[in-house]
Each structure stands twice: as structure tokens, then as C-alpha cells.
């Protein structure tokens, strides 16, 4: 197993009553809450933390892309990664990643990732998320029903730009380029830098990831128990495709608290966890699921899962196995999100 350190770079000074007075941390969060001078210190603290994670031996340090929000202050993770490429020596740099459908043309991603790979000496891990609905459909105005098609076309263009040796023309539905010939080229060219696909559980995403032989990284905010359905589905798909269950085919993001004892870890973890779950994930439902964003297979699986859960709740024999949701104890809920 390899350990990676992932930084969202959230705005750390949202007010205590944020989720009561403000409808959403994403898309329409008010600009008056942002203090650029305080953000100066935040960014430098965040960079120090990432560099320290590299120094103490994490196998990779990870950054990602979000827009118009207080949840993650990296509209361009490539800027952060390029600095880290210069300031670190042997830790992998996982940009998880660039929301491909937002780039026009997507070859900009191919070029910038190639730069990072060259600066770092071949340490880039290239992440290609489909993107959250808040980022893609609302902050950047993409059509939700076309988002995945746009994403897949952009992926094909970036991959060809990395691997084809001669200049070529690309004539897609969303991207037309007469001359594709990127300079620089990535150091990792056999055939390209490793590609990771971060996801929140969309069936189409992990199925496609399995077919492409990419690493699927599940972004789990609610513990390994909640992630079992997604990861079991991914491994079952790999088995159907006749591929081995090498654990390095998958990643699993999990929030954790570490200290000398379990109680100390819980004491240290509770306040930041409550800040993150209470404020950084305070998203207005009107931004969460635009029509056309969630695919049919994922919707069907969600409905089936709700029906199974409802059946279990109605069955007295299973009520005792429903976990912390029935305990009504705040600290237990926090614990199960990262310490269980």
C-alpha cells in the first residue's frame, strides 16, 4: 500500500454561523467572506504542509481543481503542482486533477501536464475528473447532459497529443484543431504519464476507468463502509473484464485523525471535521444535481440502494446493524467518518 497526502486548500475562516446565514459554500458564496490578505497566509501555509508531507515520506502529494467556492481554493492546481515540482525531489505529484470538459482547447491540459512532468523529472500523476456539477455546470456554464461526452472527447485529444509523434488534425464534435503538436512532451512517454480517474461513485466513471485500465480513485467522505458498494462494483467490473485485482489499480481517499491514542485523535479530529462537514460541504441542493448530470445507471443504482436500505430498516432483524445513524451521538458520527 502507498500513502498519499491530499490537500483541498479550503478557506479556513468561514464564520461559525455560515451554514445558517449562507445558502451554499459553492457557486454563489458571497465575496465579502473572502479576505485576500488572509488567503495569502493560507496559501503559504498550505504549500508548507504539502512540502512537509513530501519531506516526511508520503509516496505522493495531491492537489485538485475547484471553482467559485470556499471548499477548495485551487481553480488551477497546475500552478500549485508546478511550484511543488521545483520544491520537492522524489515524491510523486498527483494532480487530481484537471476537469477536462472545461478546457478549450483541452490540449492546454496536455501541455501544462507535460511541463509539470518535465520540471519534476517524471513524477506527475495525471488526474482527469469529470468534475462536480457545481464547478462544471454552474460556475463554468456547461450543459449537464453533454458534459460526459465533452469530457470523453477531451480525454481522447489529450491522450493523442501525448502519444502521437507527428502533427495531426483533430475534428471532434466539441474541439476542432488543424494542427496538434504539443511542446513540451512528458518525460513519462511509454506511453504517457499514469492516469488516475477520481470519482464520487458514478457507475459510468468506474466502468470506463476499468475498461481503460486506469487507476480509479474513490473520493470517500463518509468512511470505508459507505464506499464498499462503489469499490465492490469496480472490482467486480475488473473481474468481468478478466483483469487482476492488483490493489494498485485503485485508490481510496479517506479523512483520518492520527494521535498517540484514539481519544487524543478524536479530540484533535472533531473540530476540523465539524468545520469541513458543516461548512465546506454546505452545498445548496439546487446546485448539486442539475438535470442530465447523473446518468441512468447511477440513478438506477441509487434507487435500488435506497429500496434495499428501506427494506432493511423495516426488518427488525437488521435494525441493530444500521450503524451510527441510529445512535444520535455527534462524536460517534465524527469518529465513523475517519477513525473507525
Write out the residue ranges for each language-model feature.
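Active-site mouth loops of central-metabolism enzymes
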Residues: 28-44, 97-107, 191-201, 256-259, ...
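N-terminal beta1-alpha1-beta2 module of alpha/beta enzyme domains
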Residues: 1-91, 192-193
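Catalytic cores of alpha/beta
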Residues: 104-114, 260-268
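Alpha-helical packing segments of well-folded alpha/beta enzyme cores
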Residues: 42-53, 112, 154, 205, ...
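Internal, glycine-rich beta/alpha segment that forms the wall or movable "lid"
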Residues: 14, 107-214, 225-232, 236-241
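Hydrophobic faces of well-ordered beta-strands that scaffold small-molecule active sites
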Residues: 3-7, 61-63, 93-96, 124-128, ...
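An alpha-helical appendage that flanks or caps ligand/catalytic pockets
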Residues: 5-34, 148-185, 225-340
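Acidic-and-aromatic substrate-binding clefts and catalytic sites of carbohydrate-active enzymes
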Residues: 67-75, 100-106, 223-228, 258
Amino acid at each position: 500500500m502507498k500513502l498519499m497526502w491530499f490537500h483541498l486548500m479550503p478557506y479556513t475562516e468561514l464564520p461559525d454561523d455560515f451554514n445558517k446565514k449562507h445558502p451554499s459554500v459553492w457557486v454563489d458564496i458571497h465575496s465579502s467572506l473572502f479576505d485576500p490578505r488572509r488567503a495569502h497566509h493560507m496559501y503559504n501555509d498550505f504549500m508548507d504542509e504539502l512540502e512537509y508531507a513530501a519531506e516526511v515520506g508520503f509516496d505522493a502529494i495531491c492537489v485538485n481543481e475547484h471553482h467559485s467556492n470556499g471548499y477548495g481554493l485551487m481553480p488551477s492546481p497546475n500552478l500549485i503542482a508546478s511550484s511543488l515540482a521545483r520544491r520537492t525531489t522524489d515524491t510523486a505529484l498527483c494532480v487530481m486533477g484537471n476537469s477536462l470538459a472545461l478546457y478549450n482547447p483541452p490540449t492546454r491540459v496536455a501541455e501544462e501536464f507535460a511541463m509539470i512532468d518535465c520540471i519534476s523529472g517524471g513524477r506527475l500523476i495525471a488526474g482527469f475528473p469529470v468534475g462536480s456539477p457545481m464547478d462544471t455546470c454552474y460556475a463554468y456554464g456547461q450543459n449537464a447532459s453533454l458534459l460526459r461526452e465533452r469530457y470523453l472527447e477531451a480525454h481522447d485529444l489529450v491522450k493523442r497529443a501525448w502519444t502521437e509523434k507527428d502533427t495531426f488534425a483533430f475534428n471532434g464534435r466539441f474541439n476542432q484543431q488543424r494542427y496538434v503538436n504539443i511542446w513540451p512532451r512528458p518525460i513519462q512517454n511509454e506511453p504517457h504519464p499514469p492516469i488516475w480517474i477520481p470519482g464520487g461513485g458514478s457507475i459510468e466513471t468506474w466502468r470506463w476507468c476499468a475498461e481503460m485500465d486506469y487507476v480509479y480513485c474513490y473520493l470517500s467522505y463518509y468512511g470505508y463502509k459507505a464506499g464498499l458498494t462503489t469499490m465492490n462494483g469496480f472490482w467486480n467490473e475488473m473481474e468481468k473484464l478478466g483483469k487482476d485485482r492488483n490493489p494498485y489499480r485503485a485508490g481510496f481517499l479517506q479523512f483520518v485523525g492520527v494521535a498517540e491514542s484514539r481519544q487524543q485523535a478524536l479530540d484533535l479530529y472533531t473540530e476540523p471535521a465539524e468545520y469541513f462537514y458543516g461548512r465546506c460541504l454546505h452545498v445548496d441542493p439546487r446546485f448539486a444535481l442539475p438535470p442530465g448530470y447523473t446518468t441512468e445507471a447511477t440513478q438506477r443504482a441509487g434507487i435500488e440502494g435506497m429500496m434495499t436500505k428501506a427494506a432493511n430498516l423495516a426488518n427488525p432483524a437488521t435494525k441493530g446493524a444500521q450503524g451510527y445513524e441510529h445512535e444520535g451521538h455527534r462524536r460517534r458520527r465524527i469518529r465513523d467518518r475517519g477513525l473507525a
